[in-house]
């Protein structure tokens, strides 16, 4: 969590969304889901549930990126992180549906993806809480600190 404040701040830290651990995990998960649909699903699912789960998995990292791009505005950042979390939940639902209907029969693949999505959802919750508590935008925080210091000095 050392860099969390820096992650949430802005360009002063020289960071990109690519530096966010949560984005990296979301991206890895989307790639794993994509591969699962190509390697483990029957052909008839490729354009049905397979398409749905690919889109919802890719939406997680895409919403993190879009939120990060709007990080100057705390509520916008949080809004897109909440969208990312909702997409994570949607992806879990699609995965469970594929497994329970017998379209995904590989229990190891199901278990690994399920655990990865569960971890991602928990980490998204922690990240959202962190942004809510420690959001920094740069200039406004400097002005606020300067006002507090001026008030204490008088």
Which residue ranges define each predicted feature?
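Amphipathic alpha-helical assembly/interaction segments
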Residues: 1-154
């Amino acid at each position: 969590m050392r860099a969390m404040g820096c992650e949430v701040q802005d360009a002063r830290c020289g960071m990109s969304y690519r530096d966010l651990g949560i984005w990296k995990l979301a991206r890895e998960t989307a790639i794993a889901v994509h591969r699962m649909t190509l390697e483990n699903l029957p052909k008839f699912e490729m354009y049905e549930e397979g398409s749905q789960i690919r889109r919802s998995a890719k939406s997680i990292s895409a919403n993190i990126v879009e939120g990060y791009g709007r990080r100057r505005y705390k509520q916008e950042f949080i809004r897109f992180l909440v969208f990312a979390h909702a997409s994570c939940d949607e992806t879990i639902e699609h995965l469970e549906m594929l497994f329970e209907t017998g379209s995904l029969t590989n229990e190891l693949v199901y278990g690994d993806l399920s655990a990865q999505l569960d971890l991602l959802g928990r980490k998204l919750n922690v990240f959202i809480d962190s942004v809510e508590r420690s959001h920094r935008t740069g200039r406004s925080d400097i002005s606020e600190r300067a006002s507090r210091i001026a008030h204490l000095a008088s």
